UniProtKB/Swiss-Prot annotation:
The lineage of its organism: Bacteria, Pseudomonadati, Pseudomonadota, Gammaproteobacteria, Enterobacterales. Mg(2+) binds at D460, D462, D464. This is DNA-directed RNA polymerase subunit beta'. GO terms for cellular component: DNA-directed RNA polymerase complex. It is an enzyme of class 2 (transferase). Binds 1 Mg(2+) ion per subunit. Binds 2 Zn(2+) ions per subunit. GO terms for molecular function: DNA binding; DNA-directed RNA polymerase activity; magnesium ion binding; zinc ion binding. The gene is rpoC.
Amino acid sequence: MKDLLKFLKAQTKTEEFDAIKIALASPDMIRSWSFGEVKKPETINYRTFKPERDGLFCARIFGPVKDYECLCGKYKRLKHRGVICEKCGVEVTQTKVRRERMGHIELASPTAHIWFLKSLPSRIGLLLDMPLRDIERVLYFESYVVIEGGMTNLERQQILTEEQYLDALEEFGDEFDAKMGAEAIQALLKSMDLEQECEQLREELNETNSETKRKKLTKRIKLLEAFVQSGNKPEWMILTVLPVLPPDLRPLVPLDGGRFATSDLNDLYRRVINRNNRLKRLLDLAAPDIIVRNEKRMLQEAVDALLDNGRRGRAITGSNKRPLKSLADMIKGKQGRFRQNLLGKRVDYSGRSVITVGPYLRLHQCGLPKKMALELFKPFIYGKLELRGLATTIKAAKKMVEREEAVVWDILDEVIREHPVLLNRAPTLHRLGIQAFEPVLIEGKAIQLHPLVCAAYNADFDGDQMAVHVPLTLEAQLEARALMMSTNNILSPANGEPIIVPSQDVVLGLYYMTRDCVNAKGEGMVLTGPKEAERLYRTGLASLHARVKVRITEYEKDANGELVAKTSLKDTTVGRAILWMIVPKGLPYSIVNQALGKKAISKMLNTCYRILGLKPTVIFADQIMYTGFAYAARSGASVGIDDMVIPEKKHEIISEAEAEVAEIQEQFQSGLVTAGERYNKVIDIWAAANDRVSKAMMDNLQTETVINRDGQEEKQVSFNSIYMMADSGARGSAAQIRQLAGMRGLMAKPDGSIIETPITANFREGLNVLQYFISTHGARKGLADTALKTANSGYLTRRLVDVAQDLVVTEDDCGTHEGIMMTPVIEGGDVKEPLRDRVLGRVTAEDVLKPGTADILVPRNTLLHEQWCDLLEENSVDAVKVRSVVSCDTDFGVCAHCYGRDLARGHIINKGEAIGVIAAQSIGEPGTQLTMRTFHIGGAASRAAAESSIQVKNKGSIKLSNVKSVVNSSGKLVITSRNTELKLIDEFGRTKESYKVPYGAVLAKGDGEQVAGGETVANWDPHTMPVITEVSGFVRFTDMIDGQTITRQTDELTGLSSLVVLDSAERTAGGKDLRPALKIVDAQGNDVLIPGTDMPAQYFLPGKAIVQLEDGVQISSGDTLARIPQESGGTKDITGGLPRVADLFEARRPKEPAILAEISGIVSFGKETKGKRRLVITPVDGSDPYEEMIPKWRQLNVFEGERVERGDVISDGPEAPHDILRLRGVHAVTRYIVNEVQDVYRLQGVKINDKHIEVIVRQMLRKATIVNAGSSDFLEGEQVEYSRVKIANRELEANGKVGATYSRDLLGITKASLATESFISAASFQETTRVLTEAAVAGKRDELRGLKENVIVGRLIPAGTGYAYHQDRMRRRAAGEAPAAPQVTAEDASASLAELLNAGLGGSDNE
């Protein structure tokens, strides 16, 4: 018994490990793994089907084919365990050793490992500093390489062709050594002195200045150092021994019909062995050189194919013309080891079936078909049957279950009670795609799902399928109940709003129930309470919509949290009073005293959750659903064709539009408008007509006229079914109703351009053939787009998860004072997102002061919940500095304070929460709702007319920021600064509106002045950019020579003449170096200085500038000297939707990025080249000026002599995030990415909390480049993990040494994922070969910090419930204790074992 125990214990030992190291294997190491050399290419004997000796499946090397039985059958059974049979040489043991025992092949000639040769950059090439082409020519026996030059004039590593080699042999004899093939490369690698080489390179690095050379040297130094530090030897990149995979990992399976299916690896190994044996024989026979050489080359090719088929030359194909799957293919790609078997596994105890509605279920239940339950809970049933003594053995229990005896069903009921199951719907885009429910047994074969969780699963009942999984262990059940139960997931992790919200029928029912109707039956009654209201409705004495007075008792929480009753008479309707009966105590009646649409219901649930907490909300949600379904049925709302009322005015609106179009067509034919203008105008006309039709239609549907009690006519909101569905938010929208009853409108071609003839018909009238044909265009594109979108969105999610997967909350507070300023999002005249929405659930980074005072309103480190936000609003605070994950100081992970509230739970986040994955899911999940298209500007699609003025909407005072201005002759302010912002401040000091004011705008109101709503405060000419003078005086022309630098033009219509400055390309040779300018002088002809500087007022004019002044005229400050025509920038495409989000997270540079000032200083222009201008910025403090070449066609925003600040825009365009980071810092780039991503999502009406985007930005910023190494051991220009630099600097500063200086890097998410510290995580993401090659050469250690690495090695993840386990292990390791292994004595164990063997599977009662 005891040795059986020992034996069992030996079988189940698990390795405790903290890190995984990858390195090159030395030949000795490979031999030490091996259990014998494979010498023959044979696999199994075709007659006996036994493995051949010394073959690829040899039992002597790899172990027995049957458990505890040798091959010849001499020794069988357990008692001979460990004996080696003398007849067939097979050890008697378990078969499963055939999965772990390796063999080896001794190669007759060394071969290069293709990964280190061909995986770019070639490691062998870098190490030897030879080009890859040369190395390949040596390896594949085309040329010789000199290994030892000796006393000759041949250099080491010199490449010799056949002829050169023979010549050298004649000349020098055996003075020198040159070889070909892998032996040559191996000899070269062996004779390298890595440390000396390293020294030499470092010296070179210090001497050289050229950038390319430095780069190359740093690369080599890094590689050499990696070899030195990791203890890898370079010659190990050449294989002399080839390991052979255990046979059960490359199986050979007999098919029926006597054929065999085999793994491709066997073919590849067979090739290697055949060629190797042939080469050995040739060497023994001392065959001619050329034959041996050919055989060696073939061996090299065979080994290449085995390791990575198709990497070099054509892939070796099998019998069916398909390339063979090599070792490298086994691990990479979606079907490879990582993604198929390690990151995703099939699980047992699971089933799947179609889903149907379970409208009678409670929120925490799901209906499980009895058949499925019986199958899924089998082990529990067997155990219970035995425990009850209803079955003596497991076999008997099995029989009972198979016969489905009556008692089995009772047992099943018991087993299932309070045993949660998990329901999952693919695709699982966020964590709410798997939730736990308590099963309720049902007849039939479909799973029943609670309607309210459909939104979270994105499920509908048109044939969707769902999978059921059973959590087996007690811990798993506990986790499922405490964390994954549907009742615990009421709020969405993406935005903190309820995700359990009624939709469709329920909304319609509640809306119908809470509508009011003029002169309904029972109007004007006074009722004693909701009970009476219900009685009257049920007996038919009052209509659901009757306006009545009802006595209502509300309960409100007082300061102590006690409920206080308050009764009053309310004007309401019968339906609302009935609905009040299900509303939990503590909510105000006003919440139901309105027509409830979808938004109102969602708000109602949210309020309930915030005031009363989880349990009442769940009960309330269920009640809402039951009530909604009941009254939707009562309403009898149905759609008939007469509900689609076509407006009478439709016909005349369309004929008016047609007349306008005809007129424009005439203008076009007479040449007054261009084809483009005509197209745009036609589209505008039709878009306007469409809007008018749909407005007329909605007005028509919206109201109906009824007779009230006094016999007068009165308008009321209509009870039209279609209108009710759209108005309540149950189904449909105004746009869809427009297609049913208005006109379908303009259609787009697949390329996105708009067809100029609209579809004037609607679906009620029906479409004619042409209209139908035009419609198919758009419909088909929609379908193609959807398919594309799903794949793209899935890939984006995968990249996001990969970059953020190792980010976990690891401490409570990192103590930083850093943070980001939060202000409301204001675009033009409307607040897109108020401040409270942005700061809710964040932690303040500094004390928030009461505006205008020094009183602290909210102290530092406060989690801002709803009540705090109300306080901020009351005191009209419009900017709050909050903590952010981007500025968090925690080394690995982030702290709870920088993250703030856990959106799905409503309290501050717990330690161990995997915020990275949550962020990735929250951003990726709505990806499928985003559009795929790029918007072309033009047509009605998205035409913003060039703005030429600012008109405010609200009254208040004006506040200008970063403004320079002058006062012109009429006393108005003229703006002379570039990025001026105009804000409208209301009487409480809150920013209501915000506008950008361009250079040259004339302001009607000054800074701080009051304006009324609707007033125009600024205007400008959108088509030209003026040059404004800042001083008064007389104009003097400099270098303005007619015919050389300027030309005169006279306008035909007005007869005014103007001067146009010629572009440098149009000038004569003499005019090339002239710089046309306007100088301002005083009456005596002396220069006038620009106020505040010592520079004369001189304005250089760029090409194409138009001057309408004559030399010597008097001007005053604020006047326009010249105008520069602007090309209309309206033809660029705006990338929108999903591609835009991907571009932002990949940190791609836009095509023509904005040019930003690298330093602060004064702008001037240097010598021009053919196509470029030289921009020079001279700093004021006299340090070195900065020069940049800018293409001539770029429009510059700055004039010569103007002062710019670092990071100012010099030339317009989309800004590149890298530039923002470099010039304006981390916070600016965070703000930029967050705002840009939010813009895309906001357009689609998707709410995502900013935190999630910040989390991804933090991960994009996790690398830094060393600028100056200081006393640290980093290399200059090396890219290192930001946290590593921080830790190193902290240690250096503690020792009083100089830390390293660095600049933060912004990496795109793909790059960032591949650059992670963990090679396992990177390899399982993309480019597996490259990642593993790099890691092996450097001998990398994977500390297993992230989630992915731990999943792959099969451990609990260091997040969630696994966080405690990992913390515990770290504590123990720090204390130097042994890992807690279960200590069992043999006696205890044998007793319990005996019990087990006798009892079978006896579970206990508390299952």
